[in-house]
Design a protein with these regions (language model features):
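Short basic (Lys/Arg) and small-residue
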Residues: 1-159
Length: 159
């Protein structure tokens, strides 16, 4: 059965999460995987949510549902984000990968908004879980440097 490429992306996500585990501790592999996932997400986010093809032998139209941007974020990005919420290197690469993922000219505004929501969640996790103020500030600067718009500011001053 054709999974539309999501099966391979899930395997890559699993490799990234395992590479970050204390038993394996291979951040280089995790970085490589996140970079590659950013490129794949860029391609996947360009597909429309529905496609239709008329069969040549009649009046039958086959409608295909492609995986939504929201499902991609839940299946591919969230596990990496949640597992690496204390790792500023992976968080930095994930910010860059997600920014690249929505950089194409054929990405819908709806898909961009879904990725921006994931970036909001990443920013929230960063503010809440990274204790070192210098590291935290370095990663937060990425949001400005990459000109990421529509991100909410979370007040975590009491944390």
């Amino acid at each position: 059965e054709d999974d539309g490429g999501i099966g391979g992306m899930i395997k890559l996500m699993e490799i990234a999460v395992k590479a970050m585990s204390p038993g394996i501790n291979d951040p280089g592999t995790a970085v490589d995987v996140v970079i590659n996932l950013g490129q794949l997400l860029n391609k996947m986010l360009q597909f429309p949510s529905l496609t239709s093809n008329k069969l040549p032998d009649g009046d039958i139209v086959v409608i295909t549902n492609n995986i939504s941007a929201k499902d991609l974020m839940i299946s591919i990005v969230q596990p990496i984000r949640l597992y690496s919420k204390n790792d500023v290197v992976i968080l930095s690469i994930l910010i860059k990968a997600l920014t690249f993922a929505i950089s194409g000219p054929h990405i819908s505004e709806e898909n961009k908004e879904v990725v921006h929501e994931e970036l909001d969640a990443l920013k929230f996790d960063l503010k809440k879980n990274v204790d070192n103020p210098i590291d935290k500030e370095r990663v937060l600067k990425l949001f400005n440097e990459l000109n990421i718009k529509k991100l909410q500011d979370f007040d975590l001053s009491n944390k």
